[in-house]
A protein has these predicted regions:
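Conserved "landmark" site that anchors the functional core of diverse proteins
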Residues: 1-167
């Protein structure tokens, strides 16, 4: 059983009526977005990567784009039965097992202070940390690229220490 809620003409949310473990929304006529439940974390992202690997071989799929704990799938043609697509995606999600993608470490030079630190005083005020503590915490961390952005070279990163998070 599928419950459907119209949000506006080009997007409708389609969720399972009995379980809301993952949420699927239609984005236009040929695209669907599966959003992982729970927190923004590596566990959910690893399942998204696994789901992306699973659906890439679907013959009717034009493209799949992993995002931040979500996956956008774009079909070659408008599906005749959107509810069947939702069921297929949710089943694939339920069967997805965590994977870890091989990558490489890239060191990015960072300049702390001066004209590059316009938000550092606000961060220090919010966190209660000194500027040296903020720099140390930020510098010691290793960040993982969860997804690529729409601009070349832009990566969405995970791994920021909560002590230096800015809303």
């Amino acid at each position: 059983m599928i419950a459907t809620t119209n949000r506006h003409a080009s997007q409708r949310e389609i969720v399972p009526a009995t379980k809301s473990l993952a949420r699927v929304s239609s984005i236009g006529a040929r695209s669907f977005l599966l959003e992982a439940p729970g927190d923004f974390d590596l566990v959910a992202q690893r399942r998204i990567w696994a789901l992306s690997q699973t659906v890439k071989d679907w013959a009717d799929l034009a493209e799949n784009i992993p995002g931040m704990t979500n996956l956008l799938v774009i079909f070659k043609e408008t599906p005749e039965d959107p509810d069947a697509v939702v069921s297929r995606l949710l089943e694939a999600w339920e069967n997805a097992r965590s994977i870890d993608l091989k990558g490489k470490t890239i060191e990015i030079p960072v300049h702390y202070g001066g004209e590059y630190a316009t938000d550092l005083p606000a961060l220090c005020d919010l966190s209660g940390l000194s500027d040296r503590e903020v720099v140390r915490i930020h510098h010691e961390a290793t960040y993982r690229v969860f997804a690529l952005g729409s601009a070349p070279g832009f990566g969405y990163l995970h791994g920021l220490d909560p002590r230096i998070y800015m809303p």
